[in-house]
Regions:
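Beta-strand signatures of extracellular beta-sandwich domains
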Residues: 264-266
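Short, compositionally biased P/S/T/A/G/V-rich stretches that sit at domain boundaries
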Residues: 214-243
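N-terminal secretory signal peptides
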Residues: 1-7, 11, 15-22, 26
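Short proline/glycine-enriched turn/loop motifs at strand-loop junctions of beta-rich domains
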Residues: 257-261
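Structural beta-strand segments of beta-rich domains
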Residues: 246-252
Length: 307
C-alpha cells in the first residue's frame, strides 16, 4: 500500500501473505462521451465458490494505490477462507479494513424492476471515476440474488444520470484478460437467463440489483495525491490450489505533482498499519522523499518487487 503526501499519498503493497451519498448528478450531453478508469483485468481464483468478490476489490484497490492478494481479501472476513466476499453482505467490511471509502446501491429503496435505476447509479459513479462492483446472474446457476461479481470500469453515454438503451458499459469479468464491453440493452435478464442470457454468460438482474462503488482512500489529512499500482502479470499464484507464492513486480504511479515541491511516498507492508493522517509518524515500511522536477512534472513512476 502506498501513500504520497505533500512532503504524501498512500501506496499500499501487502503482498507478504501470498460515502458518497446517492444524490444524483446531472450532466446532460448531446453526443456520447466515453469515460474509462484505467484498471487492467485480473484473473480470479475459482476454488471455494470463487474469489470474484475478492478479485473485484483487489482491482479497485490497485487503482487507489493498494495491493492485497485475493487470499488476504477473504482472510479479512474469514481466516479459514471458507466464506465468500459478497456485495450487500461483507464487501464494505473488507473495503473499510483496507482504508477505502465505499457506498452501496440502496436496493431496499427502489421498486422492482430496478435495473434502469441501478444502471443510472452505476453511470454516475463511473463519471466520478469510482469503480463499481456489479453483480450478475450466470447461465446454468441458480442463486436467487446473483452468482457472480464483476468490476465496472467505464461507460459510453450521452448523459450520466439516467439509463439509455444505447449506453455501453466497460467491465472486467475476471475470466478474460481483455476488458468486456456490452450495450446497456443487452446487460440485464431475469433468473431464467432466456433473453439476453441466451447470448451472454453474465447478466445483471432485472428485478433486484446489488452494487458497491469504491470512492477512494480514507485521508483525514486531505493531503494525499492519487497513487495507482499496475502489476506485471494479470494473474497471481493461486495458493488455494497449492501453487507456491512468488514475487510479483509492480509499477507505482503518482499524479498531480507540482514541479519544485517536496513529496514523500510511503509504503505499508500490512494493511492494518495504513494511516489516514500524520503519515510521517505512522508505521510505514519504507519512505521515499523526492522533489518533483521537470523529468516528471505531473507524475512519478517507479517499480517495486512484491514478495
Amino acid at each position: 500500500m502506498f501513500k504520497l503526501e505533500l512532503q504524501t499519498r498512500r501506496n499500499f503493497l501487502t503482498a507478504t501473505t501470498l460515502g458518497l451519498t446517492f444524490t444524483g448528478i446531472a450532466s446532460a450531453q448531446t453526443a456520447p462521451t466515453t469515460i474509462r478508469i484505467p484498471i487492467a483485468p485480473r484473473r480470479q481464483w475459482d476454488e471455494r465458490n470463487g474469489y470474484c468478490g475478492e478479485c473485484s476489490i483487489q482491482q479497485a484497490a490497485l487503482y487507489f494505490g493498494t495491493y492485497v492478494s485475493q487470499y488476504v481479501c477473504r482472510a479479512i472476513i474469514n481466516t479459514n477462507q471458507q466464506s465468500q466476499l459478497l456485495v450487500a453482505v461483507n464487501a464494505q467490511k473488507v473495503l473499510t479494513a483496507l482504508k477505502l471509502n465505499s457506498t452501496e446501491f440502496n436496493y431496499n429503496g427502489y421498486a422492482s424492476p430496478q435495473f434502469q435505476t441501478y444502471f443510472g447509479w452505476v453511470k454516475q459513479h463511473l463519471k466520478l471515476l469510482h469503480p463499481v462492483l456489479i453483480t450478475a446472474f450466470v447461465k446454468g446457476l441458480s442463486d436467487p440474488d446473483y452468482d457472480h461479481i464483476m468490476l465496472a470500469t467505464g461507460i459510453t453515454a450521452s448523459n450520466f444520470t439516467t439509463y439509455n438503451s444505447t449506453d455501453q458499459l466497460y467491465f472486467n469479468d475476471f475470466f478474460s484478460s481483455q476488458v468486456s464491453l456490452r450495450t446497456a440493452s443487452t446487460l440485464n435478464d431475469i433468473r431464467s437467463m432466456l433473453i439476453n442470457g441466451a447470448k451472454y454468460p453474465f447478466c445483471i438482474p432485472t428485478k433486484i440489483c446489488y452494487g458497491c462503488a469504491v470512492l477512494g482512500i480514507q485521508d483525514i489529512s486531505a493531503r494525499a495525491l492519487p497513487v495507482s499500482i499496475t502489476l506485471g502479470n494479470w494473474t497471481e499464484p493461486n495458493v488455494i490450489a497449492g501453487v507456491a507464492p512468488s514475487t510479483l513486480s509492480a509499477s507505482v504511479s503518482v499524479n498531480g505533482l507540482v514541479v519544485g515541491k517536496s513529496y514523500s511516498l510511503f509504503r505499508y507492508n500490512d494493511y492494518r498499519k495504513v494511516s489516514t493522517a500524520n503519515y510521517t509518524a505512522s508505521a510505514y515500511s519504507t519512505i521515499r522523499n523526492f522533489v518533483a522536477s521537470g523529468t516528471w512534472p505531473t507524475s512519478l513512476k517507479t517499480s517495486y518487487p512484491m514478495a
